[in-house]
UniProtKB/Swiss-Prot annotation:
Record-given protein name: L-carnitine/gamma-butyrobetaine antiporter
Topology with respect to the bilayer: Multi-pass membrane protein
Species, as recorded: Salmonella typhi
Catalytic activity: 4-(trimethylamino)butanoate(in) + (R)-carnitine(out) = 4-(trimethylamino)butanoate(out) + (R)-carnitine(in)
PANTHER family: HIGH-AFFINITY CHOLINE TRANSPORT PROTEIN-RELATED, L-CARNITINE_GAMMA-BUTYROBETAINE ANTIPORTER
Subunit structure comment from the entry: Homotrimer.
Residues passing through the membrane, by range: 10-30, 51-71, 92-112, 143-163, 195-215, 231-251, 263-283, 316-336, 347-367, 403-423, 446-466, 475-495
């Protein structure tokens, strides 16, 4: 019994270092917000200007690696002996659901404004050229390239799960073929896992930092409650308490139902925006943007603006590549888990086609709506951002639609549910990763899950206290640096092991 109890408890070598590192960083930030902002700006500038090229090359190499998987010797290899667990339609729907977080709703509604007001390639701000390239860049940042990267890592994790029958809850578990049993279970593995978990907890905190202002701004619009940092903190606290109640009372089925509601409501809300904002314009703008993407793709892939030094690729492309890198392992583990029984080619094609369609629909509909509101002078986005902040500007793009009250209620419910499910997923992932063995069908300890949800909430509040998008962007970029190397190691470990166990026939 003692042994069983010990096995299901926390794993000290990853739990305590993570807790200490995150605690110290939060304390130093809160202690002096002005000094923290200076450090944040310095870190952002250093990483994006000195190492931005590495992120761009990584994405390009992973794109070619995707083609190797799809057309290479492993294309017809099956990931597990069983038939696919889910139908193709359900599988794609689950992938779409994973794309409808509140953070995605945040960027989808406002990103195009930044691209138009500070465009790439030396274009004039707010010019026709800037508007033509605006959506094309969104399709680039949220299109086949990053999903190809995820599909490769998903194949790697599915291989370790279903072919090699490994119990993978942390990235170090996959590194035995690359570094050997001794290093994969020693100090090296502890360092790798802590890099992964520190980056992941800050990534989750940034998502919460993006989502919370949307909910509080909705509350201000609907109920007239002023949006303050204190209200943000109260909302985050309520989410944490709600998550704790769900976990303690065994209401995980309710959380899963809420996740399904989020997916259906996302379809409904996107369909509403598509119809009432101008379906014809949206389709024309999308078609034109795909052409712009294909025409400028080579330059977008390698654009660093080393001569012009306008800062666009550093502020956006490098930031988004770091965003994709930092979530890669968590998302790939989830996508691998739902892909049991599929071939390598099926998984790669299904992910790239299904997930690209999902993100392209989101960005096209929401971005086109924002552009139309700006062009028709219905909204003054720059003024809204300057006077009230980015979240208010996003809320106003939804409030400007017909049946504004019903629309805002729908958006409020969508953001609220998306954030509840985010915190639930955060606490579950972190608890699983910082505990010893948790057998199939078992849940990680309640107090550990609640503890991590509290810490994620604190990080979200700290980032909100710093103000603006730069702290959020810097947290992602700084976290993406160590995971950049972890992702490469997982990829190389898969390739090395597959050569032995998936011998060419």
């Amino acid at each position: 019994m003692k042994n069983e109890k010990r096995k299901s408890g926390i794993e000290p070598k990853v739990f305590f270092p993570l807790l200490i590192i995150v605690g110290i960083l939060c304390w130093l930030t809160v202690r002096d917000l002005d000094a923290a902002n200076v450090v944040i700006n310095a870190v952002f500038s250093y990483v994006t200007n000195v190492w931005g090229w590495a992120f761009e090359w990584y994405m390009v190499v992973m794109l070619f690696s995707w083609f190797w998987l799809v057309f290479g010797p492993y294309a017809k290899k099956r990931l597990g002996d069983e038939k696919p667990e889910f139908s193709t339609a359900s599988w794609i729907f689950m992938m779409f659901a994973s794309c409808t977080s509140a953070a995605v709703l945040f960027w989808g509604s406002i990103e195009i404004y930044y691209y138009i007001s500070t465009p790439p390639f030396g274009l004039e701000p707010n010019s026709t050229g800037a508007k033509e390239i605006g959506l094309a860049y969104s399709l680039f940042h949220w299109g086949p390239l990053p999903w190809a990267t995820y599909s490769f890592l998903s194949v790697a994790f599915a291989y370790f799960f279903f072919v090699r029958k490994m119990d993978v809850i942390r990235p170090s578990s996959t590194l035995v073929p690359l570094v050997g049993e001794k290093h994969a279970k020693g100090l090296f593995s502890t360092i790798v896992d802590n890099f992964y978990l520190v980056a992941l907890i800050f990534a989750m905190g940034t998502s919460l930092g993006l989502a919370t202002p949307l909910v509080t701004e909705c509350m201000q619009w609907l109920f007239g409650i002023p949006h303050t940092l204190q209200l943000d903190a109260i909302i985050i606290t309520c989410w944490i308490i709600l998550n704790a109640i769900c976990v303690a009372c065994g209401l995980q089925k309710g959380v899963r139902i809420a996740s399904d509601v989020r997916s259906y409501l996302s379809f409904l809300m996107l369909g509403w925006v598509f119809i009432v904002s101008g379906a014809s314009f949206i389709m024309n703008y999308f078609t034109d943007s795909v052409g712009m993407l294909l025409m400028h793709l080579p330059r977008m892939l390698f654009y660093t603006d080393a001569i012009g030094k306008g800062g666009f690729p550093q502020g956006w492309t490098v930031f988004y590549w770091a965003w994709w890198v930092i979530y890669a392992i968590q998302m790939s583990i989830f996508l691998a888990r739902i892909s049991r029984g599929r071939t390598v080619r099926e998984l790669c094609f299904g992910m790239v086609m299904g997930l690209t369609a999902s993100t392209w629909i989101l960005w096209t509909v929401l971005g086109s709506n924002t552009l139309l509101l700006m062009d028709k002078n219905i909204l003054n986005i720059p003024q809204l951002i300057e006077q009230h902040g980015v979240a208010r500007a996003i809320i106003e793009t939804w409030a400007a639609l017909p049946l504004s009250t019903a629309t805002m209620w729908g958006f409020f419910i969508l953001c609220f549910i998306a954030t509840v499910t985010l915190i639930n997923a955060c606490s579950y992932t972190l608890a699983m990763s910082t505990c010893r063995e948790v057998r199939d069908g078992e849940e990680p300890p309640l107090l550990v899950r609640i503890g991590w949800s509290v810490l994620v909430g604190i990080i979200g509040i700290v980032l909100l206290a710093l103000g603006g998008l730069k702290p959020i962007q810097t947290a992602i970029i700084a976290g993406g640096c160590p995971l950049f190397f972890v992702n490469i190691m997982v990829t190389l470990s898969f390739i090395k092991d597959a050569k032995v166990h998936w011998k060419d026939k």
